[in-house]
């Protein structure tokens, strides 16, 4: 996926999880942050960020903050909606007979349901923006929703579904995502239980720029 109307600015601060202040053309601009996670290790004062201009003239904020530059890594996409969009693009190239997003299973909505050759698939997607010493980690904040999804996938695989949890790595040069035990031990435990049950973990490497996120060729199911 590629963004249009991208503009580079400098990050100033983040008063709350929904908005940030940036310096754009010498002026302070309030922008919407398309990620409600903490992202404290990314959003540092004077860091370069990528903004997408909204085409809605009635919005209070004119821009969405979608990417941030990290020294030693490059551009990181931090748009929380982007992982599902690029996975949908990618799944369409995988020869499935049927793909349905937002599939209701049990008490949850799982990101994707697919069918191919009489096999039923479920896939939950998680975006990874946290990097420590060359390794990606998820989550960057406690996620009870993430734990719930893993438990649903564990149930599903025992019912005969082929199940995946796909970590979309929203930065270049990283090819592994590990559970962030320190931040959310319960998620790490649920991930291990899911893997033991037969849920497959995908580490989807990406090409990333200030204005794009795409799953690289070579990633397989």
Model-derived segments and spans:
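Conserved catalytic cores of phosphodiester-cleaving nucleases, focusing on short active-site segments
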Residues: 9, 110-140, 153
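Short, charged beta-turn/beta-strand-edge "cap" motif at the junction between a beta-strand
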Residues: 13, 53-58
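Short aromatic-glycine-enriched beta-strand elements
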Residues: 16-21
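Short nucleic-acid-contacting surface segments enriched for D/E, G, S/T with interspersed K/R
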Residues: 37-50
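OB-fold/S1-family single-stranded nucleic acid-binding modules
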Residues: 56-72, 215
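A short acidic/basic microdomain associated with nuclease active sites
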Residues: 90-106
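Nucleic-acid nuclease catalytic cores
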Residues: 134-144, 154-183, 205
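Domain-level recognition of nuclease-like catalytic cores that cleave nucleotide substrates
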Residues: 170-221
């Amino acid at each position: 996926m590629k963004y249009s109307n991208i503009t580079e600015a400098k990050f100033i601060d983040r008063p709350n999880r929904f908005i940030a202040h940036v310096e754009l053309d010498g002026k302070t601009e309030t922008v919407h942050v398309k990620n409600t996670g903490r992202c404290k290790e990314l959003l540092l004062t004077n860091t370069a960020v990528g903004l997408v201009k909204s085409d809605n003239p009635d919005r209070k904020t004119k821009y969405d903050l979608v990417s941030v530059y990290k020294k030693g890594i490059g551009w990181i996409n931090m748009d929380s909606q982007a992982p599902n969009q690029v996975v949908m693009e990618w799944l369409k190239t995988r020869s499935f007979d049927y793909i349905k997003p937002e599939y209701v299973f049990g008490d949850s909505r799982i990101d994707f349901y697919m069918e191919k050759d009489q096999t039923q698939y479920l896939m939950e997607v998680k975006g990874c923006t946290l990097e420590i010493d060359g390794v990606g980690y998820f989550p960057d904040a406690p996620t009870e929703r993430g734990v719930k999804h893993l438990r649903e996938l564990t149930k599903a695989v025992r019912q005969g579904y082929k199940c995946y949890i796909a970590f979309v790595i929203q930065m270049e040069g990283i090819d592994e995502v590990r559970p962030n035990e320190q931040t959310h031990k319960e998620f790490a435990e649920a991930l291990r239980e899911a893997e033991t049950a037969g849920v497959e973990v995908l580490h989807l490497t990406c090409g990333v720029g200030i204005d794009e996120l795409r799953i690289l060729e070579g990633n397989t199911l």
